[in-house]
Design a protein with these regions (language model features):
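Conserved small/polar residues in nucleotide/adenosyl-binding loops
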Residues: 232-238
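C-terminal ends and interior cores of transmembrane alpha-helices
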Residues: 85-97
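Pair of pore-lining "gating" transmembrane helices in MFS-fold secondary transporters
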Residues: 9-26, 211-227
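Helix-loop-helix hairpin linking two adjacent transmembrane segments in secondary transporters
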Residues: 144-187
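Hydrophobic core of transmembrane alpha-helices in multi-pass small-molecule transporters
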Residues: 101-115, 222
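Helix-to-loop junctions at the C-terminal end of transmembrane segments
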Residues: 63-74
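Intracellular juxtamembrane helix-capping segments at the cytosolic ends
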Residues: 116-129
Length: 242
């Protein structure tokens, strides 16, 4: 595939599928680390799972910021920065010694891991396709669901085999081995580069303004995301003998 070839858009689909799967999967794996971490430090379930809340809020806030940066400068290095951030943070979690460090690291994961790899890269995929962008975006976004299915399972196996601290280290190494090479494949679509350099007003025949559309979609997405928060606690009942 050549950079200027529209078929390179499918390379971007694979790249974003993989990176979003790793990012979403790591967020979901908090549910697997919840029990061993809370038992070692005698934290309550609520205290420990609050890390997921912190990561979610930081991902949302920084997602807006990174989206602005992507519009101005492109996303070519977003994948590499996100990959390095995820690896570094997962490795740092292995040396956890306080709940405040736990919150800080997951805040950073949301801000510099998830936020870099979600919406900015999804937008990148959309710009590669003038036809069937919905299909391409749907495939790319499905990587998040696949990651949520497999990464927690792999994390559980690693925890059982070597403990939660070593599991974080192994995850960091796996993430770096997968994400770094694939992140180097990220390219901007020629159409987006041209549009950014030659800004012009696009005429649209649509009853709602752009701001109204964004507001309604954001409102809907918030409720969709709220429904996923409960899975943070789903692992404990299945691993606790009453």
């Amino acid at each position: 595939f050549q950079k200027n070839d529209i078929n390179y858009g499918w390379v971007m689909v694979v790249v974003v599928f993989t990176l979003s799967g790793l990012a979403f999967g790591s967020m979901a794996s908090i549910s697997v680390f919840l029990k061993p971490v809370s038992l070692e430090f005698d934290w309550s379930r609520g205290q420990t799972s609050f890390a997921y809340t912190v990561a979610s809020f930081s991902s949302a806030a920084f997602g807006v910021f990174w989206g602005y940066v992507a519009d101005k400068y492109g996303t070519k290095w977003f994948g590499l920065a996100g990959a390095l951030s995820m690896g570094f943070i997962l490795f740092s979690l292995s040396s956890l010694d306080s709940i405040y460090k736990f919150y800080l690291l997951y805040f950073l994961f949301g801000a510099f891991g998830s936020a870099l790899l979600f919406s900015p890269l999804y937008a990148n995929v959309g710009f590669w396709f003038r036809e069937n962008p919905g299909l391409a975006l749907g495939i790319a976004a499905s990587g998040g669901a696949v990651g949520q299915a497999f990464v927690p399972h792999i994390s559980g196996i690693l925890i059982e085999a070597s403990g939660w601290r070593d599991a974080y280290i192994y995850l960091a190494l796996i993430y770096l081995a997968i994400s770094l090479p694939i992140a180097l494949l990220i390219q901007e679509s020629p159409w987006r580069e041209g549009a950014r350099q030659d800004a012009e007003t696009e005429e649209r025949d649509f009853p709602l303004s752009e701001k109204a559309v964004v507001a309604w979609i954001s409102f809907a997405v918030i409720f969709c995301c709220v429904c996923t928060v409960s899975y943070t606690h789903l692992t404990l009942p299945t691993t606790t003998i009453v």
